[in-house]
Amino acid sequence: MGAVMIGARWMLGAALLSLVAPANAETLTINSGDPAAADVTDLLRISVERFEGEDGAAFAQALEAELAAATFHGSRFYRVVAPESGAPTDALVTGTVRASVDETPVIEKRRRCTEYDPADKKKCIKEIDVDIRCRRRAAVVATTVRLVAIGDGSIRYTRPLNARDQVTLCPDRSAPPSVEDYFAATFRNQVRTIRDDLAPRSYAIDVRVDESIKGLTKPAQTAFKAAVRLTKSDQTGACAAWTALTRDVEPTAALAFNLGLCNEMEGDLDAAADWYGDAQRQGARGSAVTEALARLDRCRRALGAWTARKAAMGAE
């Protein structure tokens, strides 16, 4: 418990605080982390080869930059090695990028007025169907990526990423974003997806507290609701108020859930799990408890992998 708690507390200072928006509702700010999807704990140095395809070089450069900037707990996650340098590397990322666009002529029908009411020029009294020549544009981006561990040649990660956008361009419609803009946005999204698969991430999220007063005595209801309101200005104070309530009343599902959030906010993941479990046993409604437990699991795995990685870094 101690190592997990200490590591989680460390995360409070290392999280991406820029992602936190001011809480407008009754929420508590939780700093957490997600592990890498791929098994990369022992891969400290990484190289990105040029991807195949016309856009492969630019895609690989963007991915290399994302991996070089990837951090966890305030430390760079990878040491990026240029593949042409000949320097030792632990992993090699390769892939393909294919972007294509296809346009086909299509005909759409429109109703056109051919005669207006002489007494009211805005009122149509006769319409006909006319053909409009349009173009149907289909833009496709097909990307594949693979990560190979140099030490044993094992494929640690492989994933296809496909995106498709279809629009119909007609002279009487406003123009949609250009195909170049679509390709650029898709490349950015795919690069970010790969980065999140290959490196852990820290983040902050505002989680809404449970406002239910069911099961509480009248005096406890008043104190509970006051703590809920306090979350807007003093989250620590709200948690202290809920904790004080447990000395006088049996925790309800809502109180247990909120105390789970408080402990998660403070980095005590074990205590948070206990409170969430209590809320779950008492029949807490909705998906909030399930989501909280899943978030705790991801955070624990991220912290565990980071501890193992630091050991590998020390051995190196």
Model-derived features with residue positions:
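Amphipathic beta-strand/beta-sheet edge segments enriched in Tyr/Trp
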Residues: 90-173
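Residue-level detection of beta-strand scaffold positions
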Residues: 48-51, 113, 147-149, 276
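C-terminal/domain-edge helix-coil "capping" segments
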Residues: 25-41, 135-140, 146, 150-251, ...
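Residues embedded in well-ordered secondary-structure elements
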Residues: 37, 84, 130-134
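N-terminal segment of the mature soluble domain
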Residues: 38-106, 152-154, 281, 287-315
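N-terminal signal peptide c-region/cleavage motif recognized by signal peptidases
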Residues: 20-22
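Bacterial N-terminal signal peptides that target proteins for export
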Residues: 1-12
